[in-house]
Amino acid sequence: MHAGRKTAVLIGAALAPVIAVSLPAASASAHGYISNPPSRQAQCAAGTVSCGDITYEPQSVEGPKGLTSCSGGNSRFAELDDDSKGWAVTPVPRNATFSWKLTAQHSTSTWEYYVGGQRIALFDDGGAKPGAVVDHQVDFGGLDGRQKVLAVWNVADTDNAFYACIDVNVGG
């Protein structure tokens, strides 16, 4: 091997680990969010509302089970907790369909829906792995007018859940 070629190979071998470490990693932690009616993170992804990191990761609002925040306790997505941000409000009937778009399916214990801190719907999947789209019929009962719905996807085999807030006008 010529001296110049040996030098080039050595330089290449020395730089390869540096280049590999500096390249952005592909997201292996994609999961899911409410796509319809549009959740706050769906509105961010669509550009309906100006947002930060959540614009590129609407499926990534994950946090410990039992939280009540739209951001799932994730400071990177804190704008989802801001009720004054100008979120679009979607008119829905008293018995509305909520659609989750899942980019990675996890064994699921339950799906929960809350309004004003009160659970209004619970769907038990018993550890089943869902498909790429999951629809739930949620009955708002006597609630009407503008409401903020907190939807929670509780993963069966971890201590985490996925969170989404949806601004709706029930009966509107």
From Swiss-Prot:
Q: What is this protein called?
A: Lytic chitin monooxygenase
Q: Which InterPro entries match?
A: Cellulose/chitin-bd_N (IPR004302), GlcNAc_Chitin_IntDeg (IPR051024), Ig_E-set (IPR014756)
Pathway assignment: Glycan degradation; chitin degradation
Compartments in which it is found: Secreted
> Where does this protein come from, organism-wise?
Streptomyces ambofaciens (strain ATCC 23877 / 3486 / DSM 40053 / JCM 4204 / NBRC 12836 / NRRL B-2516)
Function of the protein = Involved in chitin degradation. Catalyzes the oxidative cleavage of glycosidic bonds in chitin via a copper-dependent mechanism, leading to oxidized chitooligomers with degrees of polymerization of 4-6. Is not active on cellulose.
Keywords assigned:
Carbohydrate metabolism, Chitin degradation, Chitin-binding, Copper, Metal-binding, Oxidoreductase, Polysaccharide degradation, Secreted, Signal
> Which amino acids does the record list as binding Cu cation?
H31, H106
As cofactor, the record names: Cu(2+)
Q: CDD domains of this UniProt entry?
A: LPMO_AA10
Q: Which residues form the signal peptide?
A: 1-30
